[in-house]
Amino acid sequence: MSIQVQHVTKRFGNFVALDDVSLAFRQGELTALLGPSGCGKTTLLRIIAGLEHADAGTILLNGEDASDRHVRERQVGFVFQHYALFKHMTVFENVAFGLRVKPRAQRPSEAQIRAKVKALLELVQLDWLAERYPPQLSGGQRQRIALARALAVEPRVLLLDEPFGALDAKVRKELRRWLRRLHDDLHVTSLFVTHDQEEALEVADSVVLMNRGQVEQVGSPDAVYNTPATPFVYGFLGNVNLFHGRLEAGEGGSVLHVGETALSVPPGGVDASRADQAVAFVRPHEIDLERYAPGAEGIPVTLRRALTLGAVAQLELERTDSDDIIEVSLPIERFRAQGLREGETLVVRPRAIRVFAQGQGSEHAAAAQAAA
């Protein structure tokens, strides 16, 4: 089932949860709604499900206006963060519940229900737990049972509201890989809400980044990470360094002067004729680093702290011309080979930068990093 959200607005008192949001979700696609708490992603999910009503705008399901359609008529399966399993029912009865409460004319026979539940438990690889009760299961097992229960009624749309948020990191990683494989088998149009950037980038076909009730960017995981459309997206998806400077137009293109260093601005960046001050965004792994030598090109820094985190060394550097901190990530082998020591003077050179106008870049990136 395809879904179209057209100019949807939702307010709670004076708070605008969704502000004229328009989106299109293609049939059979797994889409992540990503953003900080309060950005409107869960509200949007609930409006699509029919659990909330928009103050303005339209929801189209397969091209038909479903704005006034009851939740039971939308053929939606919903999975919440906190399982919502019935503790007094076995795993089997929990999965069968949606089938048993259907109107008599639509209710399958007992034999059909048993066959359907058995097939679903095999699909989620938990058929051996059919006679157990929810308190006897792990968190990951309970969430898979909740998903099987949602699938039992054969929804045309599957909505997941932070389904792995209550689980520990290792179980979450295992379950999101499992969800991706399950989706590839079923091809049900699926939307899942998350504030976990890694989860969204790993699982989804498409990512919708939201902030303050509006859509910042829609695209593939690769597109939103490598070509962020706004400073907020850049700051929310992973760590980022900000280099404030003065723009200058030249024959070979624009240049951003950061202290005594000139950084080339990639084509398509901020127009130097329209903006004087700008900010360059650079990710920690996109910075070259070497020991300082007279005449060396780059931004002089002092190594303040080095942390080794598995296969990566995280360096905290302080610019010598200001108190600004620069973060650099290096493969652990390169860090050890260079033999860098705390207190040493070094030079950094950004390899890949994205430039935004001064006010736009600083304000939105700071908000994104605080939210992340």
UniProtKB/Swiss-Prot annotation:
Its main location: membrane. Residues 3-237 form the ABC transporter domain. The keyword Amino-acid biosynthesis does not apply. It is an enzyme of class 7 (translocase). ATP binds at residues 35-42. Its EC number is 7.3.2.3. PROSITE patterns: ABC_TRANSPORTER_1, ABC_TRANSPORTER_2, CYSA. GO terms for cellular component: ATP-binding cassette (ABC) transporter complex. CDD domains: ABC_CysA_sulfate_importer (cd03296). Coiled coil: none annotated. It is found in: Cell inner membrane. Gene3D superfamilies: 2.40.50.100, P-loop containing nucleotide triphosphate hydrolases. Keywords: ATP-binding, Cell inner membrane, Cell membrane, Membrane, Nucleotide-binding, Sulfate transport, Translocase, Transport. It catalyses: sulfate(out) + ATP + H2O = sulfate(in) + ADP + phosphate + H(+); thiosulfate(out) + ATP + H2O = thiosulfate(in) + ADP + phosphate + H(+). Pfam families: ABC_tran, CysA_C_terminal, TOBE_3. The keyword GTP-binding does not apply. It is a peripheral membrane protein. It comes from the Bacteria. GO terms for molecular function: ABC-type sulfate transporter activity; ABC-type thiosulfate transporter activity; ATP binding; ATP hydrolysis activity. The complex is composed of two ATP-binding proteins (CysA), two transmembrane proteins (CysT and CysW) and a solute-binding protein (CysP). Belongs to the ABC transporter superfamily. Sulfate/tungstate importer (TC 3.A.1.6) family. NCBIfam families: 3a0106s01. Part of the ABC transporter complex CysAWTP involved in sulfate/thiosulfate import. Responsible for energy coupling to the transport system. This is Sulfate/thiosulfate import ATP-binding protein CysA. It comes from Ralstonia nicotianae (strain ATCC BAA-1114 / GMI1000) (Ralstonia solanacearum).
